[in-house]
C-alpha cells in the first residue's frame, strides 16, 4: 500500500479512485459489486428525489448489507437493523438529514436506530451529502495520520470526517470527502488485502 495520504499529486489520488471498482471486485464477496453499485448510484438518487430526504427500512437494511460486505459482517447488528420499525426509520432519518450540514448531528441522530452505529449512520449521510460526509471506514482511518486507533465513536468520526473534508478541499477540482474515502479504501486494497 502506498502512502497516498501524504501525496500532493492529484494524479495519484485520481489513479487510486479509478481503481475502486477493481478493488471492490477483487474482494471475493458475493453480491458486493452489485450492492456497491446500488449504494453509489441508486440510493443517492432515491434519497434526492424525495420531498424530505430519508431512507426506508428496506434501504437501511440493504445499506447495512453493503457496509458489512465491504467490511466486517456482523450478523447481530443486521438482525437489529431489520427489527427497526419502518415508520421510525423514515422519521429518524428525515430528522437527521434535515440537520445537514452539521458535522455530527445527523450521524448522532441516525445512530439512535437499533443496530446502527456511527459507521452505518455515516453511510446514510454520505449517500445524501457526499460533499460533507465520508463513509466511516477503519481501513481509511488507519491511513490518516494523527487520528490514532480507530474508535467507533461520534467524536472519532468527527475528526475523521474533518480530515477527509480538508483533504478534499486541498485536492480541489470537484473532489468530495466521499471521493477521498474511496480513493484511500482502494489504496488499502480493501479487507481482502488486510486479511493477508
Residue spans for each PLM region:
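C-terminal accessory module of base-excision DNA glycosylases/AP lyases that mediates lesion recognition
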Residues: 1-63, 132-196
Amino acid at each position: 500500500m502506498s502512502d497516498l495520504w501524504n501525496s500532493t499529486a492529484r494524479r495519484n489520488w485520481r489513479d487510486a479512485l479509478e481503481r475502486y471498482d477493481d478493488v471492490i471486485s477483487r474482494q471475493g464477496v458475493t453480491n458486493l459489486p452489485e450492492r456497491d453499485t446500488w449504494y453509489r448510484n441508486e440510493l443517492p438518487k432515491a434519497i434526492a428525489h424525495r420531498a424530505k430526504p430519508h431512507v426506508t427500512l428496506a434501504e437501511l437494511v440493504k445499506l447495512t448489507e453493503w457496509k458489512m460486505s465491504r467490511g466486517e459482517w456482523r450478523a447481530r447488528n443486521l438482525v437489529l437493523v431489520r427489527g427497526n420499525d419502518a415508520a421510525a426509520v423514515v422519521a429518524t432519518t428525515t430528522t437527521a438529514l434535515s440537520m445537514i450540514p452539521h458535522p455530527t448531528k445527523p450521524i448522532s441522530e441516525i445512530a439512535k436506530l437499533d443496530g446502527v452505529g456511527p459507521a452505518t449512520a455515516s453511510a446514510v449521510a454520505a449517500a445524501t451529502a457526499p460533499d460533507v460526509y465520508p463513509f466511516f471506514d477503519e481501513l481509511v482511518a488507519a491511513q490518516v495520520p494523527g487520528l490514532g486507533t480507530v474508535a467507533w465513536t461520534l467524536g472519532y468520526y468527527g475528526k475523521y470526517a474533518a480530515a477527509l473534508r480538508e483533504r478534499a478541499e486541498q485536492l480541489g477540482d470537484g473532489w468530495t470527502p466521499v471521493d477521498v474515502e474511496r480513493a484511500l479504501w482502494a489504496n488499502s486494497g480493501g479487507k481482502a488485502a488486510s486479511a493477508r
